[in-house]
């Protein structure tokens, strides 16, 4: 089962390497990892998706809490907002452009670059939406793909 863990850490050099090292030493595989600054310049937020049972996730959380730079660790189990972003360079010959534009609009994606023979399309949404769009674009020929990991927040007024 996939679990999403939010980690608030000090925004300092080497923190990401220590977190990744913790996973490596314990033999845990990171499915997805995103890191960025928060509303405070001195803090970063990591969103980590890990595959495993509840016992594995419990151990990961305990180990993360032991790191000096860790401020807060929480598993996102409640109702949450989760998003990914994907940029896809897709082959777009003149006779297929209309179809590609139509699918892009249906998914509320955006064409962010146009060249003679391709589009770069930006799609955001939950994991299933992004995956479904990628699957539809395969028939046109994906030339390049860059996909972020998941970012997530618990719904409501929680902090």
UniProtKB/Swiss-Prot annotation:
EC number: 2.2.1.6
Catalytic reactions of this protein: 2 pyruvate + H(+) = (2S)-2-acetolactate + CO2
GO molecular function, a single term: acetolactate synthase regulator activity
Keyword Signal set for record: no
GO cellular component: cytosol
Enzyme class: transferase
Keywords assigned: Amino-acid biosynthesis, Branched-chain amino acid biosynthesis, Transferase
Family annotation (Gene3D superfamilies): 3.30.70.260, ACT-like. Chain A, domain 2
Pathway: Amino-acid biosynthesis; L-isoleucine biosynthesis; L-isoleucine from 2-oxobutanoate: step 1/4; Amino-acid biosynthesis; L-valine biosynthesis; L-valine from pyruvate: step 1/4
Keyword Amino-acid biosynthesis included in the entry's annotation: yes
Tree of life domain: Archaea
Record-annotated ACT domain positions: 4-78
Annotated transmembrane regions: none
Biological processes annotated in GO: isoleucine biosynthetic process; L-valine biosynthetic process
Any Pfam family matching the protein: ALS_ss_C
Classification via NCBIfam families: acolac_sm (TIGR00119), PRK11895.1 (NF008864)
Subunit structure and binding partners: Dimer of large and small chains.
Family to which this protein belongs: Belongs to the acetolactate synthase small subunit family.
PANTHER family assigned: ACETOLACTATE SYNTHASE SMALL SUBUNIT (PTHR30239), ACETOLACTATE SYNTHASE SMALL SUBUNIT 1, CHLOROPLASTIC (PTHR30239:SF0)
Protein name: Probable acetolactate synthase small subunit
